[in-house]
């Protein structure tokens, strides 16, 4: 499923009309196209309905979900919760996109009240992994002004260097030489020199498409209806303010003209009526200056009225009435299906749909954005329906995380703690414990696992008193619950060390078949995508064989979470440029990993920049299937991995999820002792997904 994100270069460019036409153009190309506007922006006269969503729903017969209210979005932004906002939008988008080949997503329109629109649009496009299409108006401005607006907006999305920035649709073009427009724009902007940035549509100005119905004039001017006539059908193609005597004005009485005149100008009223009786389909008659028409004159004009001539009155004088008409909102009214349909087809016919359809057919390198990762992680955890034990059941963050997981259906959490103690902590912290949250008093169940533990460790000389003593540690108790199959996974580490969490697992759970060691990965939520770092927490100095094992484990973990694994074996040199014991270890690990999994994309040794940055990768490792596009980064030792992970996390303010332990027969995961409630929630979700994949 492909996604196009359309965003405007300013206010009044016709973004929604372009979205209508874009969906129709994609349908012309044989694709089933859907629409979604993530954030509501109210329009004048439509206080209850989100304009874009409602108009597209009525015109195209689609059923897009309701967008988030602007007030909700502003509250989340103000609280610094943009990641939560994006995750919610990704969730709604996934639901909205089911069954479609392609989705058109409409961004926020920058206005003086929504100055943050461009920042939100940038995050939206990235979170939805979308191709970006700019929409700009070429109405009256000079070419330099047009290109300046396009370039400024393009910079928000990475400019010409971003291959996902496809081009621009130019709307409201008031020239008959649109074919020459591209060459003219190239002379004013280097952006158009890039072969990847194209004009995707040139939509000329068409007066007839902007003609409102007389009913719209009545509504917006709050006019009083004298004769409704065909006000729902007749359209205002031109407006004429009649001030001269009738004989001097008759040539202005043309089809589609709205006659504006003071209500006491009986001569103009009768002249307009005669024109209608002679077959001229005037748009209507608007009487101003608070002069009601003379009933005797209206009786004389009855023939014209019965032929459908709309007549209405306003209280404003001629000058103010003309000004009000000029200020009318020319957007398509929600109930004007005829005009919406005509504009949709007109725009669609001026969009280069063959380019967009071709783009949809091109294989795209999958990139999992942080909000999409979090959404997918939670959804898969909910589907897994796993029981996860939390040995640190008294710890406040753990209690709150368990509450969230229980309420959201992420996992069925088991707190190892006395229920009264848990309730006391929850009460003190203002946490409402949900129904069904399981709390087990460790003192009442320790002896239940003595025999099973002795059986598992009898080869090490373990006896019952020794087992009971070890079971006093809740981590050991929780690990035994996992070993006996009573729970599906274990999460600990908020107050315990990594060694205290992992040691019981190595002794009682042991490694999974086919794996020689236990390692770890962090999921690094970089701004553009989620990547995997391994091993940054467990193995100090792995051998080449162990490093190959870590690479294969990490690739499997990435794949389980929807990340396409492209594995970079990292070193301080790239390819054959360096030598030494450490480089040779990485080279040998790469060979072993490729031998074990020839279907995986694995390359090394690679320097970090060659693995992560496309331009550097092309220069340092031309022909590499991984360089510049790696999603799984395997560090040569713990010192390098842990230092890099913390440097990226802190200096770039990157959220990380993990460490997730891999290679165990059943999932056990360690927390950082500084873990937030959110960190614990996502680690529980990770554990549930791991458990489901091992069933």
Swiss-Prot record:
Organism of origin: Nitrosomonas europaea (strain ATCC 19718 / CIP 103999 / KCTC 2705 / NBRC 14298)
Alphabetized Pfam families for the sequence: AAA_26, DRTGG, PTA_PTB
Keyword S-adenosyl-L-methionine among UniProt keywords: no
One GO term describing the cellular component: cytoplasm
GO molecular function: phosphate acetyltransferase activity
Entry remark concerning the domains of this protein: The N-terminal region seems to be important for proper quaternary structure. The C-terminal region contains the substrate-binding site.
Enzyme Commission designation: 2.3.1.8
An example Gene Ontology biological process: acetyl-CoA biosynthetic process
Function: Involved in acetate metabolism.
InterPro entries per the UniProt record, alphabetical: DRTGG (IPR010766), P-Actrans_bac (IPR016475), P-loop_NTPase (IPR027417), P_AcTrfase (IPR004614), P_AcTrfase_dom1 (IPR042113), P_AcTrfase_dom2 (IPR042112), Phos_Acetyltrans/Butyryltrans (IPR050500), PTA_PTB (IPR002505)
Superkingdom of source: Bacteria
Listed pathway(s): Metabolic intermediate biosynthesis; acetyl-CoA biosynthesis; acetyl-CoA from acetate: step 2/2
Keyword GTP-binding among record annotations: no
Main location: cytoplasm
Reaction it catalyzes: acetyl-CoA + phosphate = acetyl phosphate + CoA
UniProt protein name: Phosphate acetyltransferase
Chain's gene name: pta
UniProt-annotated stretches for the region Phosphate acetyltransferase: 372-695
């Amino acid at each position: 499923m492909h996604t196009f994100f359309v965003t405007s270069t300013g206010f009044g460019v016709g973004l929604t009309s372009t979205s209508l036409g874009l969906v129709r153009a994609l349908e012309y190309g044989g694709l089933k196209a859907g629409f979604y506007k993530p954030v509501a922006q109210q329009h004048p006269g439509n206080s209850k309905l989100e304009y874009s969503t409602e108009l597209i729903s009525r015109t195209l017969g689609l059923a897009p979900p309701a967008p988030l209210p602007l007030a909700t979005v502003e509250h989340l932004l103000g609280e610094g919760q943009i990641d939560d906002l994006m995750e919610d939008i990704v969730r709604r988008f996934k639901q909205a996109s089911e069954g479609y080949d392609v989705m058109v997503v409409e961004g926020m329109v920058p206005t003086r009240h929504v100055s943050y629109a461009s920042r939100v649009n940038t995050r939206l496009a990235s979170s939805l992994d979308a191709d970006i299409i700019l929409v700009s108006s070429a109405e009256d401005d000079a070419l330099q002004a047009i290109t300046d607006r396009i370039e400024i907006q393009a910079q928000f999305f990475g400019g010409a260097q971003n291959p996902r920035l496809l081009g621009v649709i130019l709307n409201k073009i008031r020239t008959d030489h649109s074919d020459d427009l591209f060459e003219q724009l190239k002379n004013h902007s280097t952006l158009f020199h890039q072969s990847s940035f194209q004009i995707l549509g040139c939509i000329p100005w068409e007066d007839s498409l902007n003609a409102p119905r007389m009913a719209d004039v009545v509504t917006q001017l709050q006019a009083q209806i004298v004769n409704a006539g065909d006000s729902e059908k007749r359209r205002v193609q031109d407006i004429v303010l009649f001030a001269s005597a009738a004989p001097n004005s008759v040539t202005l009485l043309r089809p589609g003209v709205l006659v504006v005149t003071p209500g006491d100008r009986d001569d103009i009223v009768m002249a307009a009526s005669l024109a209608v009786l002679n077959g001229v389909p005037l748009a209507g008659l608007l009487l101003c200056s608070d002069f009601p028409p003379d009933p005797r004159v209206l009786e004389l004009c009855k023939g014209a009225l019965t032929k459908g001539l709309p007549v209405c009155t306003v209280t404003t004088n001629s000058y103010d009435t003309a000004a009000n008409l000029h200020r009318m909102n020319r957007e398509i009214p929600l109930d004007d299906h005829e005009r919406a349909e005509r504009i949709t087809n007109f725009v669609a016919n001026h969009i280069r749909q063959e380019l967009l359809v071709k783009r949809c057919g091109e294989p795209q390198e999958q990139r999992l954005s942080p909000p999409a990762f979090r959404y997918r992680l939670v959804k898969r955890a909910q589907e897994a329906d796993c029981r996860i034990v939390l040995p640190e059941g008294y710890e406040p963050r753990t209690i709150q995380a368990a509450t969230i997981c229980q309420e959201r259906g992420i996992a069925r959490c088991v707190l190892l703690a006395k229920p009264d103690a848990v309730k006391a902590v929850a009460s003190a912290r203002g946490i409402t414990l949900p129904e069904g949250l399981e709390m087990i008093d460790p003192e009442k169940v320790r002896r239940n696992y003595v025999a099973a533990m002795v059986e598992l460790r009898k080869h090490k000389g373990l006896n019952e008193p020794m087992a009971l003593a070890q079971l006093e540690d809740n981590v050991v108790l929780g690990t035994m619950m996992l070993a006996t199959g009573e729970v599906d996974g274990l999460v600990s580490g908020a107050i315990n060390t990594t060694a205290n969490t992992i040691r019981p697992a190595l002794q009682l759970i042991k490694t999974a078949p086919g794996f020689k060691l236990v390692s770890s990965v962090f999921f690094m939520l970089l701004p553009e995508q989620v990547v995997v770092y391994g091993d940054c927490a467990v193995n100090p100095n792995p051998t080449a064989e162990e490093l190959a094992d870590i690479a294969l484990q990490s690739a499997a973990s990435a794949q389980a979470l929807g990340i396409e694994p492209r594995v970079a074996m990292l070193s301080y040199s790239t390819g054959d440029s360096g030598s030494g014991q450490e480089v040779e270890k990485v080279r040998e690990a790469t060979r072993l990993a490729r031998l074990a999994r020839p279907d995986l994309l694995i390359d090394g040794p690679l320097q970090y920049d060659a693995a992560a940055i496309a331009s550097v990768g092309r220069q340092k490792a031309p022909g590499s299937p991984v360089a510049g596009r790696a999603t799984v980064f395997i560090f040569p030792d713990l010192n390098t991995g842990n230092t890099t992970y913390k440097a990226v996390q802190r200096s770039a303010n990157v959220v990380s999820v993990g460490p997730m332990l891999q290679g165990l027969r059943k999932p056990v995961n360690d927390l950082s002792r500084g873990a937030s409630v959110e960190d614990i929630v996502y680690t529980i979700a990770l554990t549930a997904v791991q458990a489901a994949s091992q069933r």
